[in-house]
Amino acid sequence: DEELEAIRSRVLHMGGLVESQVRTALAAFDKGDLDLAQQAIDADRRVNDLELELDQMVIHVIARRQPTAGDLRMIIGTAKSIMDIERIGDEATKIARAVKWLHEKGAGTRMQRVPDIQHSGEIAVSMLRRTLDAFARMDVAAAAAIIKDDRGVDDRFRATLDPAWLRAFHH
């Protein structure tokens, strides 16, 4: 169980880094701040390194311990969570790179015109925090509620990222 606890602890650490990375990327977007954008981009390397470390830990536990069905389900679920957390970090990096690109194109001052980006980002960060809390407590009911909420956030984000506002950056 020490190995499983070590994995859980590292996943929570990785999640905290990604939460900070997303907050930094959103702040960079909101302010048009290139330094914050670079910080979010730089954080991606640490997140990717943690993903590789955690993948090795998971493989080691499966190979060495031959976990019971219950532990194996938890380990596989954790492995999927690791991939999802890393992907969230990749999305934060994309936001930060967009800030740099928009600045290069002279659209840095127009970023505030993008409807609902900051609000949608805050909702996503809140969901990530709730997910990490549910993971830390192994709270299945909380996780199920987050999955339900996620569907609404996806719809809102798609509406926010409508191509119409993208054209505003090209005028």
Where are the language model's segments positioned?
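Cytosolic, long alpha-helical scaffolding segments
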Residues: 1-171
